[in-house]
A protein has these predicted regions:
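General helical secondary-structure elements
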Residues: 7-9, 26-29, 87, 199
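Catalytic glycan-binding domains that act on GlcNAc-containing polysaccharides
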Residues: 33, 51-211
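Cleaved targeting-peptide boundary
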Residues: 31-39
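Short, surface-exposed loop and linker segments with low hydrophobicity and enrichment for Pro/Ser/Thr
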Residues: 4-8, 12-13, 99, 107-109
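N-terminal secretory signal peptides
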Residues: 1-10, 17-25
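Small/flexible residues
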Residues: 14-15, 187
Length: 211
């Protein structure tokens, strides 16, 4: 097979994987192995401050219209998540935290939910073969680099979501807004199409357009 044919075959396979992600709501964890990269002292300080902020995941709104948009989103997402988390309060707590942590770092909740679907299948205590933990499959070395060193806390819902969103935002900044490369870096497969396409496909199940 020629190189051109191999590239076409790889692209076709990646597109099929992305389509499958949008059709299969709960997948096996796809966590790779995030690389432990050196951090400049200033960057490390900023990331540490971001994850150690103890503010509760309760969103605030400037207008009633903004609050209504959020409440409609919460209701819609709760319905979509019901098959995985049957207990209403558990779903609401989780979705409130996803909204808060993603918006706090300038990320779309649909992207974060799609990533969680692919990474852990919404399993709080998921552990990958590489040792990544929790909903967003955060590698334990992050607890040492920017946390308090206690990797067991990565199984705590808000802690895991906070670390995951802070790390994803950090990678997005490094990649200058290139989401494809950002997702590859998050998964430890930078430059490869399979993982980003899975997340892009899964994200479609969590898209929400305000009325």
């Amino acid at each position: 097979m020629s190189k051109a044919a191999q590239v076409v075959a790889q692209q076709r396979r990646a597109l099929l994987l992305g389509a499958a992600a949008s059709l299969l709501p709960w997948q096996i964890a796809q966590a790779g192995k995030q690389a432990e990269e050196p951090l400049a002292n200033a960057v490390q300080s900023v990331l540490s401050a971001a994850v150690l902020d103890s503010a509760p995941p309760k969103p605030s709104f400037d207008t009633m219209d903004e609050r209504l948009v959020y409440l409609r989103w919460l209701g819609a997402m709760s319905g979509r998540l019901k098959k995985k988390h049957t207990e209403h309060l558990t779903r609401v707590d989780f979705l409130e935290a996803v909204w808060y942590e993603s918006k706090r770092k300038g990320l779309e909740p649909s992207l974060v939910l799609g990533l969680i679907q692919v990474e852990s299948g919404f399993r709080k205590y998921a552990i990958s073969s590489a040792g990544a933990r929790g909903y967003m499959q955060v590698m334990p070395f992050w607890a040492r680099l920017i946390g308090d060193g206690d990797a067991s806390r990565l199984f705590h819902m808000q802690t895991n979501l906070r670390f995951g969103c802070v790390i994803l935002r950090h990678y997005l900044d490094i990649e200058r807004g290139d989401l494809f490369m950002t997702l590859g870096r998050y998964n430890g497969s930078r430059g490869r199409a399979e993982y980003p396409n899975l997340v892009f496909g899964a994200r479609k199940a969590w898209d929400y357009k305000a009325a």
